[in-house]
C-alpha cells in the first residue's frame, strides 16, 4: 500500500507538469511568429543600416518581438521625418521645372501623412490601436510612397528626377516601411497566439482589444455599442436613416445663396474651425452644380456631406494630367480626414478620355462610407487611394482603370458602367495597386452589376500583389471572355490575387478566363468568406453604426 503511494505522483505534481508543458509549447508557438532581427525582414540590409545608425538602437540577443517592432517602426519614422525635411528644402530651388515642383508638393503631403501613419502604427498609440489598425496604417504608408513616385511618372520625369529628388533615400524609406509592416504582421500573429495561450503572459497589448469586445479576427476594430475609436462620434448612430438629417445640418451650402455658404470648400474650411469634440459635422449641399475642387484635409475628421440625390447635387471639375496636374491632384473631390460619409452626390470629372488621368473622387479616409453616390469620368474616375472604405448603392462610370488605388475597399450593390473608350484603348474596370504581400489591401466588388459599351476587362495589375475579387455580380455580355488583362508581359501574374465567385450574367462564364497562377475561380464558401464585409473590411461594427444598409456576409 505504502509502496504504491510512493510510485503514484500526487495530483498537484501532475498539474504542475501539465502547466509547464503548456507553457513551453505556448512560448514555442509565440516565438515562431515573432520577427526579432533584421535578417528576418524582407529587406535585411536596409534594416541593418538604419537600425545600426538609430539613436534608439538597444538591440541584444534578448530583444523580444514587441521591442524589436517598436524599434523598427521608430527608426522608420525618423527616416520619414528626415526625408520630409530634405524634400521641403528642395522645393525652394527656382531651377525646378513646374511639373517637378508639382510632384514634390505631392510628396511633401504624402510624407506628412506617412509620419502620421507610422505614429499610429506604434503599439503604444492609444487604447484603440488594434493589430489590424496598425497594419492598415502601414499599408497606407506604402501607398503614399508609391503615389509620390507616380507624380513624376505622370510627367515622364522618372529617368531624370534623380537630379532633384533623393531617389535612394525614398527607396530605402519604402523598404523600411515594408519591413515595419512585416514585423507588425508578425507581432499581430503573436498577439493572436497570446490570446490562445494566455499562460505565456504576452497579453498586455491584446487585453485592450478583447476588453472592448474585439477578441476574434473578425472584430479587430474594437467597436461595440459602448466603445468606439476616440475620433469616432458617440452620437453617430443610424444618422443616414434619419429623414431629418438635412434639417439638422450644421452647415448648408446653396448656389442661390439660401444657405450659409455658396461653395462646398467654404463650408469645409468653416468646419475645420469649429470645436466639435468628436461630434459628427453634417454639411447639407442643396441641389445644384458646384464647379470647384474640394479638399478635406487629414485634420478634418467625421464630416458627413449630404446632397439632394444623384444628378441633383453635382460637384464637377476638369483637372487632368495632360494639362499639368498630377493624378493625385486632379481629383474634383479629395478627402483624407477619417470617418468621412457622403450620400446623394454626383462627383464628376469632365476632362474627357483624351486628357487621360482625370480623377472625380480621391479618398484616403479610413472608415469612409459612400452611399447612393455617383462617380463620373473616363480614365481613373474613382481613386480609392488607401485605408478602409465602403461603397453601397453607387454608380461608377469610366473607361481605363476607372476604379484604382491601394485601399481596402468593398463596393456592394453598385452599378459599374464601362463607357466607350478612345480608339486604341482597352476598357479595364479595376487597377488595384497592392505592392507588398503583407498589405491588408484589395478591392471586392460584391452583388453589383457590370454594364459595358464595348469589350471590357475586370481589371489589370497596377502593382505586383494586386488583389481584386468579383463575387455574386451580374457581368454583362461584353465582359471579355479572358476576364482580366495583363499590365505588361508576365508582370505580377504569379503574385497577384484575382478571384471570381458566384457571378451570373452573359459575361460570367469562367471557361475562357486567363490561366495565370494568381487567378482563382473561388469554389468554396470558406474561401469566399475571406472577402466579406465582416472578414475583409472588419466593417460589421463601423459601417452598421452609420445606418447604411450592409450585407456583412456573402
Swiss-Prot record:
Protein name: Probable pectinesterase/pectinesterase inhibitor 6
Keyword Nucleotide-binding recorded: no
Function recorded in the entry: Acts in the modification of cell walls via demethylesterification of cell wall pectin.
GO molecular function: enzyme inhibitor activity; pectinesterase activity
Top-level taxon: Eukaryota
Gene Ontology CC terms, in alphabetical order: extracellular region
Tissue expression: Expressed in rosette leaves, flower and siliques.
Glycosylated sites: 119, 172
One Pfam family in the UniProt entry: Pectinesterase
Family, per entry: In the N-terminal section; belongs to the PMEI family.
Pathway in which the depicted protein is active: Glycan metabolism; pectin degradation; 2-dehydro-3-deoxy-D-gluconate from pectin: step 1/5
Major localization listed first in the record, in broad terms: secreted
Residues reported to bind substrate: 327, 357, 460, 462
Enzyme class, broadest EC rank: hydrolase
EC assignment: 3.1.1.11
Disulphide bonds in the chain: 394-414
GO biological process: cell wall modification; pectin catabolic process
Region of interest: Pectinesterase 6: 250-540
UniProt keyword terms in alphabetical order: Aspartyl esterase, Cell wall, Cell wall biogenesis/degradation, Disulfide bond, Glycoprotein, Hydrolase, Secreted, Signal
Subcellular location, record wording: Secreted, Cell wall
Signal peptide region: 1-32
Amino acid at each position: 500500500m505504502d509502496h504504491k503511494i510512493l510510485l503514484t505522483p500526487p495530483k498537484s505534481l501532475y498539474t504542475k507538469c501539465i502547466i509547464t508543458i503548456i507553457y513551453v509549447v505556448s512560448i514555442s508557438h509565440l516565438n515562431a511568429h515573432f520577427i526579432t532581427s533584421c535578417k528576418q525582414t524582407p529587406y535585411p540590409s536596409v534594416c541593418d543600416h538604419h537600425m545600426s545608425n538609430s539613436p534608439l538602437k538597444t538591440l541584444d540577443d534578448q530583444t523580444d518581438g514587441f521591442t524589436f517592432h517598436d524599434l523598427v517602426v521608430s527608426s522608420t519614422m525618423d527616416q520619414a521625418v528626415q526625408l520630409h525635411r530634405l524634400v521641403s528644402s528642395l522645393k525652394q530651388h527656382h531651377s525646378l521645372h513646374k511639373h517637378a515642383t508639382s510632384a514634390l508638393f505631392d510628396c511633401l503631403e504624402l510624407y506628412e501623412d506617412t509620419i502620421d501613419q507610422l505614429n499610429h502604427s506604434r503599439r503604444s498609440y492609444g487604447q484603440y490601436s488594434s493589430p489590424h489598425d496598425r497594419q492598415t496604417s502601414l499599408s497606407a504608408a506604402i501607398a503614399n510612397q508609391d503615389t509620390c513616385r507616380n507624380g513624376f511618372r505622370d510627367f515622364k520625369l522618372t529617368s531624370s528626377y534623380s537630379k532633384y529628388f533623393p531617389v535612394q533615400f525614398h527607396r530605402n524609406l519604402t523598404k523600411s516601411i515594408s519591413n515595419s509592416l512585416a514585423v507588425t504582421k508578425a507581432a499581430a500573429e503573436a498577439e493572436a497566439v497570446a490570446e490562445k495561450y494566455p499562460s505565456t503572459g504576452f497579453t498586455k497589448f491584446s487585453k485592450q482589444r478583447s476588453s472592448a469586445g474585439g477578441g476574434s479576427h473578425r472584430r479587430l476594430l474594437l467597436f461595440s455599442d459602448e466603445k468606439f475609436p476616440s475620433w469616432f462620434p458617440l452620437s453617430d448612430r443610424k444618422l443616414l436613416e434619419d429623414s431629418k438629417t438635412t434639417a439638422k445640418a450644421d452647415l448648408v451650402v446653396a448656389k442661390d445663396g439660401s444657405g450659409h455658404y455658396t461653395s462646398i470648400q467654404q463650408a469645409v474650411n468653416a468646419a475645420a474651425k469649429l470645436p466639435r469634440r468628436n461630434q459628427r459635422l453634417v454639411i447639407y449641399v442643396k441641389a445644384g452644380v458646384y464647379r470647384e475642387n474640394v479638399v478635406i484635409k487629414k485634420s478634418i475628421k467625421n464630416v458627413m456631406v449630404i446632397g439632394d440625390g444623384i444628378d441633383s447635387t453635382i460637384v464637377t471639375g476638369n483637372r487632368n494630367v495632360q494639362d499639368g496636374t498630377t493624378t493625385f491632384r486632379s481629383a474634383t473631390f479629395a478627402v483624407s480626414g477619417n470617418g468621412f460619409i457622403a450620400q446623394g452626390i454626383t462627383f464628376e470629372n469632365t476632362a474627357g478620355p483624351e486628357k487621360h488621368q482625370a480623377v472625380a473622387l480621391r479618398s484616403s479616409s479610413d472608415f469612409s462610407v459612400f452611399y447612393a453616390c455617383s462617380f463620373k469620368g473616363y480614365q481613373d474616375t474613382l481613386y480609392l487611394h488607401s485605408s478602409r472604405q465602403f461603397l453601397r448603392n453607387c454608380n461608377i462610370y469610366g473607361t481605363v482603370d476607372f476604379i484604382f488605388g491601394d485601399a481596402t475597399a468593398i463596393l456592394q450593390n453598385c452599378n459599374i458602367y464601362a463607357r466607350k473608350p478612345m480608339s486604341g484603348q482597352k476598357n479595364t474596370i479595376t487597377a488595384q495597386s497592392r505592392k507588398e504581400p503583407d498589405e491588408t489591401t484589395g478591392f471586392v466588388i460584391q452583388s453589383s452589376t457590370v454594364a459595358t459599351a464595348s469589350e471590357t476587362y475586370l481589371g489589370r495589375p497596377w502593382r505586383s500583389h494586386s488583389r481584386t475579387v468579383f463575387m455574386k455580380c451580374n457581368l454583362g455580355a461584353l465582359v471579355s471572355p479572358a476576364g482580366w488583362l495583363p499590365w505588361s508581359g508576365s508582370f505580377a501574374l504569379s503574385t497577384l490575387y484575382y478571384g471570381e465567385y458566384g457571378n451570373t450574367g452573359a459575361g460570367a462564364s469562367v471557361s475562357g478566363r486567363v490561366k495565370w497562377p494568381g487567378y482563382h475561380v473561388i469554389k468554396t464558401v470558406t474561401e469566399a468568406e475571406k472577402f466579406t464585409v465582416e472578414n475583409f473590411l472588419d466593417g460589421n461594427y463601423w459601417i452598421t453604426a452609420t445606418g447604411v444598409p450592409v450585407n456583412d456576409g456573402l
